[in-house]
Regions:
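ATP-binding pocket architecture of kinase catalytic cores
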Residues: 64-160
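A cross-family kinase active-site recognition segment
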Residues: 134-191, 215
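Conserved protein kinase catalytic core
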Residues: 79, 132, 227, 244-246, ...
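Conserved NTP-binding catalytic cores of kinases and kinase-like/nucleotidyltransferase enzymes
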Residues: 2-109, 231-233
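Structured catalytic core of nucleotide-sugar glycosyltransferases
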Residues: 102, 112, 229, 254-255
Length: 269
């Protein structure tokens, strides 16, 4: 336990340092720059800008003259390729076309959803209001389950060609290799590698024991922060982490409490 605690503290410290050093990639996003990017695409801003919560990207609510504000999402450079972002847009637009309540990007007159301005890629979205869902109510969980079921039915109808796949290799072996290269103190490397190897071996056996595991297009980051509750309905936002994965990837982050409580929640969904 002490080993894991020390490794975790070191990792968090390193990640904070790395995050601070990478802040320069967004340093250019001044209010003037943001307004210029929006107006370059034909909208007339009224000068109001409100930064919204986002971990990887930068997201702003921008006021528009005589119209409703828009949401602008500026993508973190080098995180996704253009093809991957466009697959995100296509998937959410496909869901919207099927009358599912998701927030999909807006398309300009040329039919483009991925916009650029002075080296930054961004997309515009309609502003949608709502509150966090109350998942301690069974009826709300059942609504979530029905909507997710429809999302997954459509997700299974086609495949991603460029978005990543959730796998033990990418989320397990590759992550361990990355941490050992840079983040784990040298005196803890051997112990960490031994522990990681044991855990990954167990996971390999578990994965091998599951036959016919179906992979499909999923939201990928389905926690309550990416769900707006309005008019007794769940509205899904931010498909930035959509990927190919089992359907459970969109369910487990909605569960909380004791094992018994989580089982009940899972049954409702």
């Amino acid at each position: 336990m002490l080993l894991l605690l020390r490794a975790t503290i070191t990792l968090i410290g390193g990640l904070m340092t790395d995050q601070n050093s990478s802040e320069h990639v967004f340093a250019k996003l001044s209010p003037d720059f943001i307004l210029s990017a929006i107006e370059d695409n034909g909208l007339h801003c009224d000068g109001r800008i409100l930064e919204l919560n986002s971990y990887e990207n930068r997201v702003y609510q921008i006021g528009i003259e005589d119209e409703q504000p828009v949401i602008g999402k500026f993508y973190r450079p080098q995180r996704w390729s253009n093809e991957q972002i466009l697959e995100e847009h296509t998937f959410s637009s496909e869901l919207l076309a099927a009358e599912l309540s998701v927030v999909a990007p807006e398309y300009d007159e040329a039919g483009q959803s991925l916009l650029t301005f002075e080296g930054f890629r961004f997309a515009l979205f309609k502003r949608k209001g709502g509150r966090a869902p109350e998942l301690d109510r069974d009826e709300n969980l059942e609504i979530m389950g029905r909507v997710l079921g429809r999302i997954h039915n459509i997700g299974a109808s086609q495949t991603f060609n460029h978005r990543p796949t959730l796998s033990l290799q990418s989320f397990g072996f590759d992550s361990v290799e990355y941490l050992c290269e840079k983040w784990i103190p040298s005196e803890l490397i051997n112990s960490y590698q031994s522990l990681s190897s044991d855990l990954l071996s167990i996971l390999e056996d578990r994965m091998a024991s599951v036959s016919g595991l179906k992979q499909l297009r999923v939201h990928g980051d389905c926690h309550i922060g990416n769900v707006l509750w309005r008019d007794n309905m769940a509205h899904f936002i931010d498909f930035d982490d959509c990927r190919t994965a089992p359907a459970i990837q969109d369910i487990w982050m909605l569960l909380s409490g004791s094992r018994e409580e989580q089982r009940h929640q899972l049954m409702c969904i």
